[in-house]
Structure formats: C-alpha cells, structure tokens
C-alpha cells in the first residue's frame, strides 16, 4: 500500500485537493469516538452480541439438552470435536463468501445457519440427528469466528482498529457471558428445554 500497490485490485480515490486516498488502506479508519457516533457500530455490535449469546448458550447446555432428548452425555460430548473440525474446515469457505458477496448477505447467511442450528438442536433424537446438528453448528461457528475478525475493519477501517474492535469484542464477550443465563433460568423454572 505504501508504494501504491493495493490488495484485491482496489482503486485509490482522488480527493478534491488532488490528494490520493485509499478508503480501505491502513491510513483510513474511524476513531473509536467516530465509530461510536454511527448507527452501524451498534448494529454490528448487536448482531455479534446476539450471536455470541446464542452460541455460548448452546455450548454450555449441549450435554444437558441432549440428555433431556434421550441421548447419552458421551454422544453429546463427541459432538464438540465434530463441530470444531467442521468449523475449521468451513472457515476458508466463509472467507471466500466474504470476498465474493456483499457483507450483509454473508451476515444473513450466518444468521440463517444459527437459526438452522437452533432448529436442529430441538430435533436431536438419535446419533444421526446429533451429527447433523454438530455439522450445522460447526458451520455456524465458522461464520461467527470469521465475522468477528472481519466486520470491524470492513466498516470502520484499520487505522484505529485496536480501539474499535476492542470495544466491539467487549460487547460480544458480555453477550457470551450473559447468554447462558436466560436458558438456565428457563430450565430451572420449567424443568425442560422445550
């Protein structure tokens, strides 16, 4: 970038005062104060926070949910490494999707896989449906992990990425921390996950 070469065929923008600006370069970026003044920051933060809440709740209660649906704890436990392997294998595909499709479309794909994971979790009744859930949940985790690193520089640039992403990640971690609480409380009140 410093010698005029840009990634992915990006083009520079010529400013009114003949200054060349690369809107995706390292010199571009919102400060944290500027980012916090945009609705986009809160939309992205809310999306990532919500996804974190649900994913963490599923991780925390997977064994218990499977047990209540008639499966053994060992089957539930074996689905964790399967999901992890699927997530690792799927992340490059998610990265290609982010290169190829508009960002909102990929976020929609991520939310669709999260919905599919939630739905498939409710239908787990045997080993085959448990494996299906683990595969879908792994794909969802690949979307989440990739989006967490991608969205902040995509919308706010790289110059102040530490403070912007740090604040956004904090919101995501708060979501992950409180996510299991409502599900746990609901189970305590109703003695069931359905």
Outline where the language-model segments fall.
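Paired small-residue
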Residues: 117, 128-136
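C-terminal ends and interior cores of transmembrane alpha-helices
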Residues: 113-125
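Intracellular juxtamembrane helix-capping segments at the cytosolic ends
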Residues: 143-156
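Interfacial helix-cap and linker-helix signal at transmembrane-aqueous boundaries
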Residues: 66-67, 97-98, 182-191
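Loop-to-transmembrane helix entry/capping segments in MFS-fold secondary transporters
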Residues: 73-74, 158-168
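MFS transmembrane alpha-helix packing/gate-lining sites
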Residues: 86-90, 140, 171-175
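Cytoplasmic membrane-interface "Motif A"-like loop-to-helix N-cap segments
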Residues: 99-111
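Extracytoplasmic gate region of multi-pass secondary transporters
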Residues: 30-94, 103, 149, 179
